[in-house]
Design a protein with these regions (language model features):
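Sec/Tat signal peptide C-region and signal peptidase I cleavage site
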Residues: 13-19
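Beta-strand-enriched cores of mature, soluble protein domains
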Residues: 19-158
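Sec-dependent N-terminal signal peptides
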Residues: 4-13
Length: 158
């Protein structure tokens, strides 16, 4: 009887998979196309669609050498915004994807800061969750596009 009980406990433990978790601190640069309605005096509505490449300070992190595609928008009032929202897809080196929703605030033409929530993914990251902080500093580049340095840090579990 003890052997059977031990076998049941052993099989239960050996089939139990522990969730993996980690931290990340990724940075990179990107560009995005803009649609804008300018009402003057620093009042403007903007939507954007852009891409960026990221490297993590920890080589081998799931976000290291990833790219992200983001679609979002914001409304400037007297040159400031506090309503930026959007969604990003991260294309990971292993071929999988991770999705986030984000919110932010900042100053038009300069950049902003915000928070994000990891909402899911594909494959082994299907049930990924997490959250973090992001910042963006606008930089000069090709006319007609917006360009920025991006930084994202946070934690995840899958």
């Amino acid at each position: 009887m003890k052997k059977i009980l031990f076998l049941i406990i052993f099989l239960t433990i050996s089939n139990y998979s522990l969730a993996e978790s980690g931290k990340f601190n990724a940075a990179g640069a990107g560009s995005r196309s803009l649609n804008a309605m300018d009402a003057g005096n620093g009042n403007m509505s903007i939507t954007y669609d852009g891409n960026a490449g990221l490297m993590d300070k920890e080589p081998g992190s799931i976000f290291d050498k990833s790219t992200m595609h983001c679609i979002g928008g914001l409304t400037l009032v007297s040159g400031k915004f506090d309503d930026e929202t959007g969604m990003c897809t991260f294309y990971l080196m292993d071929g999988e994807k991770v999705y986030i929703n984000y919110k932010g605030k900042g100053t038009g033409g300069q950049g902003g800061t915000g928070t994000f929530v990891i909402i899911g993914g594909t494959g082994k990251y299907e049930n990924i969750s997490g959250s973090g902080f992001s910042s963006r500093q606008n930089i000069r580049g090709k006319a007609g596009m917006a360009h920025s340095m991006n930084q994202m840090s946070g934690e995840y579990t899958y």
